């Protein structure tokens, strides 16, 4: 490698947490995924906060929260402001994931980490790409190109290929799946041969995966036994990723008459179920060849489900007849409708709970997977209830004070606007106050008259101030006021009101009432719940198994391998296997959390800063696509560089934690003090944190002219004799090969010695010097 390649792990190494890594390619820094775990760990945010000012671009691989969950917080709260790249489905389905996650949390707790506006602001920054679309970066990223390739795990899931100057090839491939499924094709990593660096995960490195046919039979058997026993089936799934595979599978089973499931109900329950299905209908071209052919030949959209009912709340689900199979989010059972249904159904032995996803350790779903024999567990019951009594009165009083304060602020703003427009108002003659009719078109002031010297027998206008409301308009006409077009809400019938008050439908389950416009509070209590329902884990994660991962890496033959996201024993197993396959041809790294891996293969590559005075004195020679120059200078290690572009003298960085730091006497001039203040204003008063993030880059200064040593000329870009022959012929010099020697005008011989150098022989004549000059022109001489 001729580039500096470094990877800093912010989260998701030696564990199964969210994925977030900082990749440095020379001066450009990529953030590979921006995930957040189910518990919204602060450690991930703290790690991200230290590097957020360095990030130049974000690459998102999958739409689920483990890959992009922290993006709204990073954009809304940390100030992340850079280009974000993702495929079109990751953009659309990622929004669905985050909307559903926010609403699931908000329904039962006071969730304030991010809002729906933060989600929209973050996704507005995403540049949407198609598979195999090459994007050439600009600015600091000049010479870099990124290409998204299909990963086969979720719709739009991406393997990122990063290429530097057409030579260095970096592949970021996590959570990929090489097997073809109902709704997705598998990935084809074998096409990426001999990348310079491969970054992959070890999540499934030691996992033995049952065959797909066996898993489908297990699912069908479980569903049939439960439904025929008059029980309900809860399948915990994600919002808009792997749920599409299960929805396709179950809808196909329901269509099969032999299965006998047509009499039972099938439902999809999450906060955005309708939008997920609608987006899926418009993204068939991103799916498997089988679904594409079905859509093209039969003109039948595969996501036009016949048996799957779409539900947005427990009230919708209550209208679906029992027994039923429900696909509910979230897969971790930490929040959402899946948790609500689990609490309701787990104490009935007739029911069945099917888990399809190994979530992060510490979640309820992972606890049930790892401890299948546990029948009693403590669960925190959270819900949102209406305010009543004294709490409601206090809330109303607070809201009243807020409205009064807002009204006063609005009045003060209007007063400022009126005073600024007073000069404009005085120029216009007041119209009658009774004339307030609005027109469909912009009308000139009707009835307005200009005052004149002569008395007019017309109706006089009021003499007291009667300002008319100024109609605001832009280049499109009058500005529309939304309140003028609001439709009055239809009054609910007495029957509907009674249903809402009772909160029951068909005598089954309590309806979830819309509490968005009602003052509420969140309450929680921890209870011990006995699990009597059957709990089963069936793998529908859509990842490659351990043996396949090892074979794929062996076929790719990467020069360097960085293993992330997986338990330590799985990472160790994958590393040993790859070393056994590749031997000395592969370097394997298993970084720890917050560790920086230097994947630069060339050990003698360093970054230096050149003074302007030195650059202006250089004499460049062109060699192919590059320009070369000889430099005589001296290194100065006193200057520290921070990626914001603000430079500090080394002596000004006071870090008490580093006792061994070299003490350098820095000039205490006013400019240095100003620079230090600028750094504090950018990063706050935490000087220790600043010192940790400061990277020392030496500065190369020019030598005084009398100290510059001489050097022998260096000849670079050595030509081939056949090419030099063509140059001589173009200049009118006869040249031909005789025994491997190029003879020119029968007077000068050009030969290549055993050491590979080119020698010139012949009598000292005009042709000799002319041929020598032409030969020199073929070199870059510095």
Curated annotation (Swiss-Prot):
Residue ranges, annotated region (Disordered): 407-449
Localization: Nucleus
Similarity-based family: Belongs to the metallo-beta-lactamase superfamily. RNA-metabolizing metallo-beta-lactamase-like family. CPSF2/YSH1 subfamily.
Biological process annotations from GO: mRNA 3'-end processing by stem-loop binding and cleavage
Signal peptide range: none
Organism, as annotated: Mus musculus (Mouse)
Residues recorded with modification Phosphoserine: 419-420, 423, 660
Database matches in Pfam families: Beta-Casp (PF10996), CPSF100_C (PF13299), Lactamase_B_6 (PF16661), RMMBL (PF07521)
Highest taxon of the lineage: Eukaryota
A cellular component annotation (GO) from this entry: postsynapse
Keyword vocabulary terms for this entry: mRNA processing, Nucleus, Phosphoprotein, RNA-binding
Keyword Phosphoprotein on entry: yes
Lineage, uppermost ranks: Eukaryota, Metazoa, Chordata, Craniata, Vertebrata
First-listed, main subcellular location of the protein, grouped into a coarse class: nucleus
SUPFAM superfamilies on file: Metallo-hydrolase/oxidoreductase
Bias-annotated ranges (Acidic residues): 417-430
Protein name from the UniProt record: Cleavage and polyadenylation specificity factor subunit 2
Biased composition (Basic and acidic residues): 407-416, 439-449
Subunit organization: Component of the cleavage and polyadenylation specificity factor (CPSF) complex, composed of CPSF1, CPSF2, CPSF3, CPSF4 and FIP1L1. Interacts with CPSF3, CSTF2 and SYMPK. Interacts with ZC3H3.
């Amino acid at each position: 490698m001729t580039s500096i390649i470094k990877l800093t792990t912010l989260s998701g190494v030696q564990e199964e947490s969210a994925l977030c890594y900082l990749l440095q390619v020379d001066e450009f820094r990529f953030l590979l995924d921006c995930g957040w775990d189910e518990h919204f760990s602060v450690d991930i945010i703290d790690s991200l906060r230290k590097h957020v000012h360095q990030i130049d671009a974000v690459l998102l691989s999958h739409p689920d929260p483990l890959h992009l969950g922290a993006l709204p917080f990073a954009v809304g709260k940390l100030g992340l402001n850079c280009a974000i790249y993702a495929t079109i489905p990751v953009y659309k389905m990622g929004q669905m994931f985050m909307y559903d996650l926010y609403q699931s949390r908000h329904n039962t707790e006071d969730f304030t980490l991010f809002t729906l506006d933060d989600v929209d602001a973050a996704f507005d920054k995403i540049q949407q790409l198609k598979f195999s679309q090459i994007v050439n970066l600009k600015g600091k990223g000049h010479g870099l190109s990124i290409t998204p390739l299909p990963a086969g795990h979720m719709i739009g899931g991406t393997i990122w290929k990063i290429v530097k100057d057409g030579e260095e090839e970096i592949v970021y491939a996590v959570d990929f799946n090489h097997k073809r499924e109902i709704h997705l094709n598998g990935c084809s990593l074998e096409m990426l041969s001999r990348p310079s660096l491969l970054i992959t995960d070890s999540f499934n490195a030691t996992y033995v995966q049952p065959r797909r046919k066996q898993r489908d039979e297990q699912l069908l058997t479980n569903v049939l036994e439960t439904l025929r026993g008059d029980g309900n089936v809860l399948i915990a799934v994600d919002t808009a990723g792997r749920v599409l595979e299960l929805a396709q599978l179950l809808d196909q089973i329901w269509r099969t008459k032999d299965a006998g499931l047509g009499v039972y109900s099938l439902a999809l329950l999450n906060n955005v179920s309708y939008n997920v299905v609608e987006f899926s209908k418009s993204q068939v071209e991103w799916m498997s060849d089988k679904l594409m052919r079905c859509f093209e030949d039969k003109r039948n959209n595969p996501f036009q489900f016949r048996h799957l009912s779409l539900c947005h709340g427990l009230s919708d689900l209550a209208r679906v007849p029992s027994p039923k199979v429900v696909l509910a989010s979230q897969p971790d059972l930490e929040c959402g409708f899946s948790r609500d249904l689990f609490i309701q159904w787990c104490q009935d032995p007739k029911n069945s709970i099917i888990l399809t996803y190994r979530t992060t350790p510490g979640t309820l779903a992972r606890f049930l997977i790892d401890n299948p024999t546990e029948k009693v567990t403590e669960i925190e019951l959270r819900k949102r209830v209406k305010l009543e009594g004294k709490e409601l009165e206090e809330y109303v009083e607070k809201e009243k004070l807020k409205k009064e304060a807002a009204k006063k602020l609005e009045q003060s703003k209007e007063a400022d606007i009126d005073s600024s427009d007073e000069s404009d108002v005085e120029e216009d003659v007041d119209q009658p106050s009774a004339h307030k009719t609005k027109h469909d078109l912009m009308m000139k002031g009707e009835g307005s008259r200009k005052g004149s010297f002569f008395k007019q027998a017309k109706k006089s206008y009021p003499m007291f101030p009667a300002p008319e409301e100024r109609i605001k308009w832009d280049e499109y006409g009058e500005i529309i006021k939304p309140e003028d077009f609001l439709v009055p809400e239809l009054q609910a019938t007495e029957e509907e009101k009674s249903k809402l008050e009772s909160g029951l439908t068909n005598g089954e389950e309590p309806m979830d009432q819309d509490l968005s416009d009602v003052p509420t509070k969140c309450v929680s209590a921890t209870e011990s719940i006995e699990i009597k329902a059957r709990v089963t884990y069936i793998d529908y994660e859509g990842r490659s198994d351990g043996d396949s991962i090892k074979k794929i890496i062996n076929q790719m033959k990467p020069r360097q391998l960085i293993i992330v996201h997986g338990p330590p024993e799985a990472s160790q197993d994958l590393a040993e296997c790859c070393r056994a396959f590749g031997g000395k041809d592969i370097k394997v790294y298993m970084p720890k959390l917050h560790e920086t891996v230097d994947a630069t293969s060339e050990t003698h590559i360093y970054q230096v800063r050149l003074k302007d005075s030195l650059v202006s004195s250089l004499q460049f020679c062109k060699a192919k696509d590059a320009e070369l120059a000889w430099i005589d200078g001296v290194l100065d290690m006193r200057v520290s560089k921070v990626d914001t572009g603000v430079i500090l003298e080394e002596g000004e960085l006071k870090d008490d934690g580093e006792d061994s730091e070299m003490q350098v006497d820095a000039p205490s001039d006013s400019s240095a003090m100003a620079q230090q203040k600028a750094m504090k204003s950018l990063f706050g008063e935490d000087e220790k944190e600043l010192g940790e993030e400061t990277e020392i880059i030496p500065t190369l200064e020019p030598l005084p002219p009398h100290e510059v040593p001489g050097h022998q000329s260096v000849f670079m870009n050595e030509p081939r004799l056949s090419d030099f022959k063509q140059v001589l012929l173009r200049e009118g010099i006869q040249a031909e090969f005789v025994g491997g020697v190029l003879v020119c005008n029968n007077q000068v011989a050009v030969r290549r010695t055993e050491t590979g150098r080119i020698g010139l022989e012949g009598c000292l004549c005009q042709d000799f010097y002319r041929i020598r000059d032409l030969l020199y022109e073929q070199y870059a001489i510095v």
